[in-house]
Amino acid sequence: MTVRKNQATLTADEKRRFVTAVLSSSAARYDTFVTTHNEFIVADTDNGERTGHRSPSFLPWHRRFLLEFERALQSVDASVALPYWDWSTDRSARSSLWAPDFLGGTGRSRNGRVTDGPFRAATGVWPITVRLDGRTYLRRALGGAGRELPTRAEVDSVLSIPTYDMAPWNSASDGFRNHLEGWRGVNLHNRVHVWVGGQMATGVSPNDPVFWLHHAYIDKLWAQWQRRHRTPAYVPAAGTPDVVDLDETMKPWHDSSPADLLDHTGHYTFDTD
């Protein structure tokens, strides 16, 4: 059984294996993940179904997305699991995940270019090919947006919200999903993307490997919320236009519904509850 661990507790060998597996993914295969994520960035006013963001399926869609990536890593090294980044505890640019032997640190002040760690441009092994501008290197500006990372108290305030989601099922909704996603309230998920900066603050955010650690923690928070509340684990149940209902399969895979992904324990567990 795959066990997802807090990145702060990883051994040097576990870090090395994770980095090696990410770097061993073919560029074309990795770019598919980046492209898929970017294609599912939508606004409330866009026509058609909202699936990956600004909708109830934000959490099961990303759970399915992370499973796909984790399996890709395990095809390289079966011992690898996605670690998670608890940004409510590891809250600074000096935290262990930003070390040169893991993800590397922040970027240059003038252009955001990351200059240390295994994903820096100088290695020549991490070119950014799915991009929104001409820059072909990994960029970050840790903390540069001014607002600090979410606190544990802010996380707890969101976990206390009893209702998973509600109409209008978008970024105006006042439920757990939308507060966790960050369009309402204290702003958890979105705020972390902006804090990291660079590609993480855009639709091509999986270009930065920290994307996976961030979303593994978002997934863990969803699991914690599920254990805490007896209310329906996912809504809407059926018959809702422009969003994914409980038993409706999700694009682009068409093989999993939110109902299929409510219980993660058949795929992986976490090191702590």
From Swiss-Prot:
Cofactor(s) annotated in UniProt: Cu(2+)
Top-level taxonomic group: Bacteria
Taxonomic lineage of the native organism: Bacteria, Bacillati, Actinomycetota, Actinomycetes, Kitasatosporales
Function comment: This is a copper-containing oxidase that functions in the formation of pigments such as melanins and other polyphenolic compounds.
Molecular function GO labels: metal ion binding; tyrosinase activity
Protein residues bound to Cu cation B: H189, H193, H215
Family, similarity comment: Belongs to the tyrosinase family.
Cited Gene3D superfamilies: Di-copper center containing domain from catechol oxidase
Keyword Metal-binding: yes
The reaction(s) this protein catalyses: 2 L-dopa + O2 = 2 L-dopaquinone + 2 H2O; L-tyrosine + O2 = L-dopaquinone + H2O
Free-text remark on how the cofactor is bound: Binds 2 copper ions per subunit.
E.C. designation(s): 1.14.18.1
The protein, known as: Tyrosinase
Biological processes, Gene Ontology terms: melanin biosynthetic process
InterPro entries: Di-copper_centre_dom_sf, Tyrosinase/Hemocyanin, Tyrosinase_Cu-bd
Entry binding sites for Cu cation A: H37, H53, H62
Keywords: Copper, Melanin biosynthesis, Metal-binding, Monooxygenase, Oxidoreductase
Keyword match Nucleotide-binding: no
